[in-house]
């Protein structure tokens, strides 16, 4: 079984890799590409960066002496991640940080030059990765089939293009989709235990009494990073904040109702929904209702048994009856009308 998994991963990565290793391009002026120009200037760092051009993205580094095999693998994974997002969401980010017409992913040196381990604009192109030189290169040397999933997370911020249709879940969307991309690429996840933990949180939540809105949104008393679940002694469980809870729910829905076919139908439906700005519990509930409607439409069945019975979303009897009577296989849904 392990041999089969290895060969499957190797086959996925080999199929998407360029025929020849990438070659570094001539240095380019990145003063309009880096996110925090002042930080680079204060650190007296050169803004002449080296481009490595992939199919969909331009990857910028400070060093042209990197192992071409490593950079080729890294860029191939990013390219496949970009294609996965574009295919499953049916959308693309607005152009912002580009080089020669291609979105940029910049490997920035350590030293507080970007927002944390990585940074990505929401709904627009441009990603910076701060762990590339100190961590990612070393991890590739340990496992040449590995890829750090934070690269797909930051691309997810670029690919959040749904405005207030799903804005309660922007960060959770990126957490969920990074794992969708990892599966599509077939790269080894060196933090696989983290994924298993996140997937397990759905069952922990289902067996708890935590309320739906407080768990999945920030409009019922908890901020994004606050733990949503507690152990038997009332202590916060690790890694169960709001984005994780959304991701664990979506990973379950994806697994149970059709894989990436379900994901693609879900985002197609979401794009047809009206925008609902979540300013209070009532509007957050309406945005969650859109989540349920799109999930049911993608699954071709009423998913209130999951959302309401298992996850404790509050709907009255009339609403539950309405869901039971719908023909969820109908391709001509008027999502705007349903959510008014």
Predicted regions and their residues:
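Long, contiguous juxta-domain segments that are non-catalytic but functionally important
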Residues: 20-47
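Bacterial N-terminal signal peptides
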Residues: 5-14
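Boundary at the C-terminal end of the N-terminal hydrophobic targeting segment
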Residues: 15-19
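Surface-exposed patches in mature extracellular/periplasmic domains of secreted proteins
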Residues: 87-107, 161-169, 188-194, 261-268, ...
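Zinc-dependent metallopeptidase catalytic helix centered on the HExxH motif
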Residues: 133-207
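Juxtacatalytic substrate-recognition/specificity segment
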Residues: 46-162
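Beta/coil-rich, acidic/histidine-enriched accessory regions frequently appended to metallopeptidases
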Residues: 24, 279-340
